[in-house]
């Protein structure tokens, strides 16, 4: 059975994320440990952490992934932002270890004029400064590629992995890949994309999927998510992606919108329908 869940809230306690996931009929999931729009430390007490670990195990929900702050910029040439980003990431990987969450997901960020190679060097060296606990892996998320943001090409993802001797793998976001020019709207396009990823990065580095349809055309670098099968990737592309052998054992987490009377439960059900139809 396909592993699929959604991004859930920790409001009222991190263990509430498990209950929310169960309401959605999800079997894995993603959380923020704090508001992603501000520099803030995770504030998760021992009792909360124990309750989260126990409830996840009891309900069979996992693997979970922590999504890092949107303010983190590993590629930045600015020393103060770099130090804040490293500090934030250290606290996220420590929180992951406490919660027994195996993954922390991060966007590489933007080089803001320093250039692609320098940006990749900056990201890799920032990641090298982390003391990543055993059992935790940092996932570099593929990006839509607007402005000077890095991580939109498989070559850039591989560039960071090759430069860094840390437990690093990749989270592919379907909407971001599509925006970056990887055409996932047809079975042929999906197959070609996975072949290119395997040749450049390696499928052994693919640990998680952000499964989202896109409201914008392929190659526009515009990141706006749509309901599964109802965006520009469409039903045929989503079906081909969900059922491709490359992701047979890779969990999917949704970041789809709540609109038009549809939210996470509808999208999770839709993923399972597309999986079963193949």
From Swiss-Prot:
Keyword Metal-binding among UniProt keywords: yes
Residues engaged in binding Zn(2+) 2: 141, 173, 210, 255
Cofactor stoichiometry and binding remark: Binds 3 Zn(2+) ions.
InterPro entries the UniProt entry points to: AP_endonuc_2, AP_endonuc_F2_Zn_BS, Xyl_isomerase-like_sf, Xyl_isomerase-like_TIM-brl
One GO-annotated biological process of the protein: base-excision repair
Catalytic activity: Endonucleolytic cleavage to 5'-phosphooligonucleotide end-products
Residues that, per the record, bind Zn(2+) 3: 176, 223, 225
Keywords: DNA damage, DNA repair, Endonuclease, Hydrolase, Metal-binding, Nuclease, Zinc
Record bears the keyword Nuclease: yes
EC numbers for this chain: 3.1.21.2
Cofactor or coenzyme needed: Zn(2+)
GO molecular function: deoxyribonuclease IV (phage-T4-induced) activity; DNA binding; DNA-(apurinic or apyrimidinic site) endonuclease activity; phosphoric diester hydrolase activity; zinc ion binding
Binding sites annotated in the UniProt record for Zn(2+) 1: 67, 107, 141
NCBIfam families for this protein: nfo
UniProt xrefs under HAMAP family: Nfo
Biological function: Endonuclease IV plays a role in DNA repair. It cleaves phosphodiester bonds at apurinic or apyrimidinic (AP) sites, generating a 3'-hydroxyl group and a 5'-terminal sugar phosphate.
Family: Belongs to the AP endonuclease 2 family.
Protein name per the record: Probable endonuclease 4
Organism of origin: Natronomonas pharaonis (strain ATCC 35678 / DSM 2160 / CIP 103997 / JCM 8858 / NBRC 14720 / NCIMB 2260 / Gabara)
Name of the encoding gene: nfo
């Amino acid at each position: 059975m396909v592993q699929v869940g959604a991004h859930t809230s920790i409001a009222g306690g991190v263990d509430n994320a498990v209950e929310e996931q169960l309401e959605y009929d999800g079997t894995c999931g993603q959380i923020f440990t704090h508001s992603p729009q501000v520099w803030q430390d995770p504030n998760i007490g021992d009792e909360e952490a124990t309750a989260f670990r126990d409830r996840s195990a009891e309900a069979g929900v996992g693997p979970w992934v922590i999504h890092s702050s949107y303010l983190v910029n590993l590629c930045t040439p600015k020393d103060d932002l770099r130090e804040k980003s490293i500090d934030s990431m250290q606290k996220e990987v420590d929180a992951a270890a406490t919660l027994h969450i195996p993954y922390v997901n991060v966007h590489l960020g933007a080089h803001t004029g320093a250039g692609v190679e320098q940006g990749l060097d900056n990201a890799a060296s920032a990641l090298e400064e982390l003391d990543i606990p055993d059992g935790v892996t940092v996932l570099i998320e593929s990006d839509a590629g607007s402005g000077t943001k890095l991580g939109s090409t498989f070559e850039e993802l591989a560039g960071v992995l090759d430069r860094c001797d840390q437990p690093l793998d990749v989270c592919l976001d379907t909407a971001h890949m599509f925006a970056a020019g990887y055409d996932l709207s047809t079975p042929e396009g999906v197959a070609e994309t996975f072949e290119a990823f395997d040749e450049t990065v390696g499928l052994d580095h693919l640990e998680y999927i952000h499964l989202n349809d896109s409201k914008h055309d392929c190659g526009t670098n515009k990141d706006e998510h749509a309901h599964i099968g109802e965006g520009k990737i469409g039903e045929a592309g989503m079906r081909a992606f969900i059922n491709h052998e490359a992701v047979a054992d890779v969990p999917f987490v949704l970041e789809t919108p709540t609109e038009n009377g549809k939210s996470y439960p509808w999208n999770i059900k839709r993923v399972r329908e597309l999986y079963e139809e193949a």
